[in-house]
Amino acid sequence: MSSSLLDSATGVPTSMPVPQARGPLSATLVSILRSSADPRELTAAADAYEVARSTDLTYDILRDDDAQLTLTLLYELHLQGIENVSDAWEWNLDLLAARSRLETHFEAAIVELVGKVPSSGDVVADLWAMTAPSAGPGLASFMAKDATIDQFAEVLIHRSLNQLREADVHTLGISRLSGAVKAALVEVQSDEYGGGSAERMHSRLFADTMRAVGLSDRYGHYIDAVPAVTLASLNALSLFGFHRRHLGALVGHLCAVETTSALPSKRYSAGLRRLGFGSDATLFYDEHVEADSVHEQIAVRELAGGLASSQPHRTDDILFGAATCLAFDDLLGDHLTSSWEKGETSLRE
């Protein structure tokens, strides 16, 4: 069976379209997925990748389009799937082996990016300190006051790969938790899924925003447009979600999302209104202003605090996950602003 389902309400395909390859790794994987070629070819490509990168002291996997796209596709086999690609590939051992090798390099790069995360022993206090609003103007302030419609569209495109499936990867943590900690995550995620109302699902609200500004709301439609840094942020979350050993990081990542969302969402909504858009464009952000003000308390105190109390060995990983989320947000923000300052698009052309 292949992944080619349609959303029952919109008729939009729910699986990711097959993207254009960005190098030998992704070209090999796309060939395998499209033609059922020998999956061992990806292992051979991974061998060549490791040899080529081992002597390059300037190499940065976080900015490697080929490696990041390959990881994105390998993870996507476990999520919405890839259009007209057999679901049988999801647990193919050769693809899993190649993914594991790429993950080793990717995780090492994340650790280097984040560095040593200070810990006071009080995970709740540490999370509040890490996610406190910065004094600088930031991307959200620019979007509120100065961003053009085209710049808003670019931000939405970068965010779309995650927001059109919002909550799905974090939800993977539910089955790995128990008791009050599980209940806290379920409470947060229930709101993300609209409390049972499809029209109120946050992913659906984001799709409404995309349509309002003239963009496609198809899941993965802009996969070819986003650079490695965007895919790396997406892949870091998938890394945490698909590995039980990173349960703490998954929880910490969610805490960072929830605690840094309300104020920026208010500014994004203001920016869209400044540009003349109405509630069909702003409801996604308006909803997050209210919801995430509540979610942040549940996520930090009951979810992260509860997990650290019941499983103290996960405390450092909780902080690592939060720091990773913040670091990738900074990388993407820097990419956006530096591109615009040079009069360039932040998207691939």
What role is predicted for each listed range?
Residues S2-E349:
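Non-heme di-metal
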